Amino acid sequence: MTPPRPEKVALFTTCLADFAAPGPALAAVEVLEAMGMEVEVPPRQSCCGQPALNSGYPAAAKPVIDQTLAAFDGYDAIVSPAGSCTGMLVKHAKDATEITEAKQRVLDRMWEFTQFVTTYGADLDLVLDATVTYHDSCHMSRFLGERTSPRLLLSRIKGITLIEM
């Protein structure tokens, strides 16, 4: 059963989009708005904490995780174009910080972009005449266990020929 359609969506841009490659975040906003979503980018969001946690410094990860989760409180859905960052928060924030009821409420509303679009964007009219391939994101497939949504989204784009790697 599809969850109720969210009204107020926040975009978790991630450090990568903020500092190096904004294209995926900008494209995500464009698609979400085409779906009729009101998209906000909370200015107080920070990092998911993955660099510190993966380096063995959970105490350094805690404040950025706490700040990021607090920034997203009150949104119906939080969408991120980065499976790695989504997976970090959803599956591993608990390794660095106490998960309070408020934090869990935010974590329960986090979506990786392709999961969100395949759930709520079935009526999008997507067209791209191209041959493409798709490489499973290591963290998205391992942290989130997600391999289906990206291919499902690609299958909904008219004109695409998908060649598996």
Model-assigned labels for residue ranges:
Residues 1-165:
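Iron-sulfur cluster-binding electron-transfer modules in prokaryotic oxidoreductases
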